[in-house]
Amino acid sequence: MNNIWWQSKGQGNVHLVLLHGWGLNAEVWRCIDEELSSHFTLHLVDLPGFGRSRGFGALSLADMAEVVLRQAPDKAIWLGWSLGGLVASQIALTHPERVQALVTVASSPCFSARDEWPGIKPDVLAGFQQQLSDDFQRTVERFLALQTMGTETARQDARALKKTVLALPMPEVDVLNGGLEILKMVDLRQPLQNVSMPFLRLYGYLDGLVPRKVVPMLDKLWPHSESYIFAKAAHAPFISHPAEFCRMLVVLKQRV
């Protein structure tokens, strides 16, 4: 059984595991890892098939969560960005005793638009899947450009994301496709009503992938959770607003 790439740093008395989004890798956290490792024992992870975690094909969400858990500390705050938010949520559902708090960043329990549920139109996700087989580097770059659109620092934020992608070999097409399949099909809205650990949801007001309309809907569906919207951020608030982002996690640490 393959292991995934995993790096731990810092000496904090609380463990914090960071899970990246689709098409990316753990290098995306370099803008905040120094600050966070001064407060936490920080764990940077390349999800199976992404970055340095080679030798995996496309996995289901449940399998991806199990692979990640194998190398994880007994107890930690789990933070997942975008697709990583689904992985962290899945772990909170299946192994709640291992999760001190759940943090989702620019993530939705159901990324795909459904009846009376705002999200990414299924044909857009299907289009990305189709384009992957034609020109997958360009498709990934288009997806990244969507993530920073509208912010004051959109250009440099997009450059930071692109640099992260290009720093390591591109994931295999079937892995990227499998990730899009998860974004297209998974719906955790009902299951997450039952989690009891502290649950913090962070959003960008300008996010083009996770519409802000979902925030009040989830506030109502999950009254035990807390939400916060970064007013001038899009899909990557930790890149556009690193200091504010880290502050929120340090405050959360006091509660676990």
Curated annotation (Swiss-Prot):
Binding site for substrate: W22, S82, L83, F143, L144, A145, L146, Q147, H235
Main location: cytoplasm
Catalytic site positions: S82 (nucleophile), D207, H235
Any one GO molecular-function label of the UniProt entry: pimelyl-[acyl-carrier protein] methyl ester esterase activity
Pfam families listed in its UniProt record: Abhydrolase_1
Reactions catalysed according to its record: 6-carboxyhexanoyl-[ACP] methyl ester + H2O = 6-carboxyhexanoyl-[ACP] + methanol + H(+)
Enzyme Commission designation: 3.1.1.85
Keyword RNA-binding among UniProt keywords: no
Pathway entry: Cofactor biosynthesis; biotin biosynthesis
Keywords per UniProt: Biotin biosynthesis, Cytoplasm, Hydrolase, Serine esterase
Keyword Cytoplasm included in the entry's annotation: yes
One annotated GO biological process: biotin biosynthetic process
Compartment(s) of residence: Cytoplasm
GO CC terms: cytoplasm
Sequence ranges assigned to domain AB hydrolase-1 in this UniProt record: 15-242
Superkingdom of origin organism: Bacteria
Homology family: Belongs to the AB hydrolase superfamily. Carboxylesterase BioH family.
Subunit structure: Monomer.
NCBIfam families in alphabetical order: bioH, PRK10349.1
Function: The physiological role of BioH is to remove the methyl group introduced by BioC when the pimeloyl moiety is complete. It allows to synthesize pimeloyl-ACP via the fatty acid synthetic pathway through the hydrolysis of the ester bonds of pimeloyl-ACP esters.
PANTHER family in UniProt: HYDROLASE ALPHA/BETA FOLD FAMILY (PTHR43194), PIMELOYL-[ACYL-CARRIER PROTEIN] METHYL ESTER ESTERASE (PTHR43194:SF5)
Protein name: Pimeloyl-[acyl-carrier protein] methyl ester esterase
This protein's encoding gene: bioH
